[in-house]
From Swiss-Prot:
GO annotation terms (biological process): regulation of translational termination; translational termination
CDD domains named in the record: RF3, RF3_II, RF3_III
Record keyword GTP-binding present: yes
Protein's name according to its UniProt entry: Peptide chain release factor 3
Gene source species: Vibrio cholerae serotype O1 (strain ATCC 39315 / El Tor Inaba N16961)
Domain tr-type G: 13-282
């Protein structure tokens, strides 16, 4: 273990690695932009809605995202903030892209939950919070869009507490909303920060009024709003939870901030809280033991593979979360699944689509390894030790289509493209044992569009979909070899191999699946599979 004075300890302790979770349109991409702006990582924050201009948001860089204005793939951005170095993992905001998002949440130590204050808790936020629950991830909450008419702030906090089962501790409190939005009162600092709208890359000077009873406050926001603020705060402070860092770190309590990302207001208050309270890199469970971030030997795992980040290079990048130790250019690593030593000299770090060669990186950082088809999601890299990090899920798809070619001569390219897209988690592919069909499985409809669009632009293959009689899929395994062979013989017409050659049962109806499970109780039918 390390003494807390070593340079390595200093580097690791200033890392904060987090992801943003929200319902589509709650303002997540705008928040991402503004977080980077306050971290001085970009000078011009491009808003996604500016369709006509070339200024697409920095974190949305794939062609299809540029057209639709939604974040379809996870990007990684690193920037300094105060004394910390922040790694922000941007997750797909569109409701369909849950698998990629779920896996990204395995690579972070905390999350920022963005809620549209006009709408409250929405469906996608509920689902993502369930995933963060699996690892008790600490959550910071940002109530967004205060420059619009919003719901009652007390109601919003009650809804978060009741629906998401997490206690709320307000850190800032809004003064008015919509056209009447005047700013926030910072409960911990006992000061009012007045709102002046900043747009794009303008960070406005803040006017601060010290103390809740300061007569300046009445002059600045008007006597009525000032009186309302004092009244609300008396209620709020009596009824809500005090901030407790231990409960926050256990994922049981969330600090709540109010603001408007579009107006560049409140994002810095939230960042101050996040960098102060969120944990530095956390220990991680491997099958063999728990790995601490303070260990000096390198370990890391692949949580995502992204093809063709750079159309000029036609490359694929494996995103590795470093769990412990230091990556140094040119170092040797053990690719555990293959039992192979590899020399890594060209890992990259990210500023959303802008890649820089990494000289070194530390626990908590994300690096990109060039991948020529040998790296898969869930792979572990170490400095020699044989370890397998656990908890990186694959989910059974909920939607299925048969895919076929307009030009039958391109079957080879189609298969290659589909296998690569399935390795990076964009889609799942099933090849039935009894015919030459290719069945594509997805968690959401938009994934199908993405696959066709990427097959065309990256593999020059024109594919079309047809309906297919598949309701669900389950991965199957059995400890009794003899019984498994018998099961395979009897169910040949329902079996398929996925992109990684794992056997799956393809059920035309849920009734069929239930019957198959009843008839073969010794066979395990799994809805998720560890990578």
């Amino acid at each position: 273990m390390l003494m807390s004075t070593t340079p390595y300890f200093g580097e690791v302790s200033k890392r904060r690695t987090f992801a943003i979770i929200s319902h589509p349109d709650a303002g997540k991409t705008t928040i991402t932009e503004k977080v980077l702006l306050f971290g001085r990582a970009i000078q011009v924050a491009g808003t996604v809605k500016g369709r006509g201009s070339n200024q697409h948001a920095k974190s949305d860089w794939m062609e299809m995202e540029k057209e639709r204005g939604i974040s379809v793939t996870t990007s990684v951005m690193q920037f300094p903030y105060g004394d910390c170095l922040v790694n922000l993992l941007d997750t797909p905001g569109h409701e369909d892209f849950s698998e990629d998002t779920y896996r990204t949440l395995t690579a972070v130590d905390s999350c920022l939950m963005v809620i549209d204050a006009a709408k409250g808790v929405e469906d996608r936020t509920r689902k993502l919070m369930e995933v963060t629950r699996l690892r008790d991830t600490p959550i910071v909450t940002f109530m967004n869009k205060l420059d619009r008419e919003i719901r009652d702030p007390m109601e919003l906090m009650d809804e978060v507490e009741n629906e998401l089962k997490i206690a709320c501790s307000p850190i800032t409190w809004p003064i008015g909303c919509g056209k009447e939005f005047k700013g926030v009162y910072h409960i911990h600092r006992d000061e009012t920060i007045l709102y002046t709208s900043g747009q794009g890359h303008t960070i406005q000077e803040e006017r601060i009024i010290k103390g809740l009873d300061n007569p300046e406050l009445d002059q600045a926001v008007g006597a009525d709003l000032a009186a309302q603020l004092r009244e609300e705060l008396e209620l709020v402070l009596g009824a809500s939870h005090e901030f407790d860092r231990e409960l926050f770190l256990q994922g049981e309590l969330t600090p709540v901030f109010f603001g408007t990302a579009l107006g560049n207001f409140g994002v810095d208050h939230m960042l101050d809280g996040l960098t102060q309270w969120a944990p530095s890199p956390m220990p991680r469970q491997a099958a063999e033991r728990v790995v601490e971030a303070s260990e000096e030997k390198f370990t890391g795992f692949v949580f995502k593979i992204q093809a063709n980040m750079d159309p000029k290079h036609r490359d694929r990048i494996a995103f590795v979360r470093i769990v412990s130790g230091t990556y140094k250019q040119g170092m040797k690593m053990n690719h555990v699944r293959l039992g192979k030593q590899v020399n890594i000299s060209d890992a990259v770090t990210f500023m959303a689509g802008d890649r820089a060669r990494a000289e070194e990186a530390f626990a908590g950082d994300i690096i990109g390894l060039h991948n020529h088809g040998t790296i898969q999601i869930g792979d572990t890299f170490t400095q020699g030790e044989t370890l397998k990090f656990t908890g990186i899920p694959n989910f059974a798809p909920e939607l299925f289509r048969r895919i076929r070619l307009r030009d039958p001569l391109k079957q080879k390219q189609l298969l290659k493209g589909l296998v690569q897209l399935s390795e990076e988690g964009a889609v799942q592919v099933f090849r039935p044992l009894q015919n030459n069909d290719l069945i594509v499985g997805a968690v959401g409809v938009l994934q199908f569009d993405v696959v066709v669009s990427r097959l065309k632009s990256e593999y020059n293959v024109e594919a079309i979909y047809e309906g297919v009689n598949v309701a669900t899929a389950r991965w199957v395994e059995c400890d009794d070899v003899k019984k498994f062979e018998e099961f395979k013989r009897k169910n040949q017409s329902n079996l398929a191999l996925d992109g990684g050659d794992n056997l799956a049962y393809i059920a035309p109806t849920m009734v069929n699946l239930n019957l198959a499970q009843e008839r073969s109780p010794e066979v395990k039918f799994r809805a998720t599979r560890e990578h």
